[in-house]
Amino acid sequence: DSLNNMNERIILSSMDGFEVYKIADIIRCEANGSYTTFFIKEDRKVVTSKTLNNFEKLLSDLPFVRVHSKHLVNINYIKKYISGRGGYIVFEDGSQVDVSERKKKEFIRLMKVHARST
C-alpha cells in the first residue's frame, strides 16, 4: 500500500558516505546532468551521483510524478498549479518548478487521481 511505502526510508549516497531519509519527507528531486539534488523538508538538500531516471523508477509506485525532464515531484507537497504552455507548480515551501508541455496532461491526470477536486 502506497501510504506504508511513504513511511519507508531511502538511502542517499553522499561524498562522505550516505544519509537516510523518510521517503515522505522528500519534496522534489531535480536533475543536474548525471547528478540528482533532493529537496527535503526543513530546507535540507542532498546531492547524489545517480540520475533522476534511477530515482523515478525507484519511486514509481508512490505519489511522485515526473513533470519535466529535470523534475520529479512529490504531489503531496504541491500547493498550486499555474497553467500556461506547460505551466508551473508552486510547493508548500514556496519553491517553483516548470511543467513541460509534454508532461502536463499526465501530471493533471495524476493530481486528480490523488486529490479530490471540485
Spell out what each predicted region is.
Residues 32, 107-108:
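General helical structural elements
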Residues 56, 108-109:
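A cross-family signal for key residues in well-ordered alpha-helices
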Residues 1-92, 96-98:
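Conserved binding/recognition cores within well-folded domains
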Residues 109-118:
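Short, charged, intrinsically disordered terminal tails
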